[in-house]
A protein has these predicted regions:
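N-terminal glycine-rich phosphate-binding loop for ADP-containing cofactors
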Residues: 1-231
Length: 231
């Protein structure tokens, strides 16, 4: 089956947008979001905001417009691709990422001193970056989403939505769900794809926590069988 853009790009860009929009909603710092949507999830350490800066914020805006144009209106991608005022302002003022004056992160040079700064999503102001430690006794995905703090809430919100979106593409876009996992491993350098994440979290655990997945035939079928070895 065909799909606008490569399969990995569709899921990968959706994942980036979910990680970003959920951070705007939950009001974590961008350092916190990148610390969670990074190594703890088996995702490169750039996270989402660092990756945005690396790719180019203006280029990402063009990528989103392309997907919006090509994907049907009912596709959930549209919900996470809406223009964000702060992002629009960054582009307009030349803060397009590493190739520009900076982006979500910037290097502030004062004489011989260089200080890495991060933007505040609410105010648009920059301040020195803070090192975030999200380590816990449980370092697997299941342990991460079961944390009783804002990091656990953010991790679950992001991971569950990525899994829901990826599974909505089966079997309409691809008949083999592991094709999506392979695309994410090869194209975005993830340690595990969405369905491998689901397997690690545990099928029963996933459905104990998730609320609505109506219309998603893959998840509806899996919820009936509760097959932990679906992979």
């Amino acid at each position: 089956n065909d799909t606008p853009g490569f399969l990995g790009n569709r899921v990968g860009v959706y994942a980036m947008q979910i990680a970003m929009t959920e951070d705007f909603k939950m009001k974590l710092s961008i350092e916190e979001a990148d610390a969670i949507f990074g190594r703890p999830m088996g995702i490169p350490k750039t996270g989402v905001f660092g990756l945005y800066d690396l790719i180019g914020i203006d280029l990402m805006a063009d990528v989103l417009k392309s997907f919006i144009k090509e994907l049907p209106e009912k596709d959930e991608f549209h919900e996470v691709a809406k223009e964000i005022p702060l992002v629009k302002k960054l582009i307009e003022t030349g803060y397009t990422g590493r190739k520009g004056k900076g982006g979500f992160y910037r290097m502030n040079k004062t004489g011989a001193t260089k200080i890495m700064e991060a933007i505040n999503l609410e105010t648009g102001d920059y301040s020195p970056t803070k090192k975030i430690d999200v380590k816990s006794d449980k370092v697997d995905l299941k342990g991460l989403i079961e944390r009783k703090d804002k990091y656990g809430d953010y991790a679950w919100s992001v991971i569950s939505k990525i899994i829901k979106y990826a599974s909505s593409l089966v079997p309409g876009i691809t008949k083999e769900f592991n094709d999506i996992d392979e695309a994410m491993r090869l194209g975005f350098n993830w340690a595990k794809g969405p369905f491998e994440m689901l397997e690690e979290i545990g099928v029963k655990n996933f459905f104990d926590k998730i609320n609505n997945f109506s219309g998603n035939s893959f998840l509806e079928n899996l919820s009936k069988t509760k097959n932990e070895d679906f992979y």
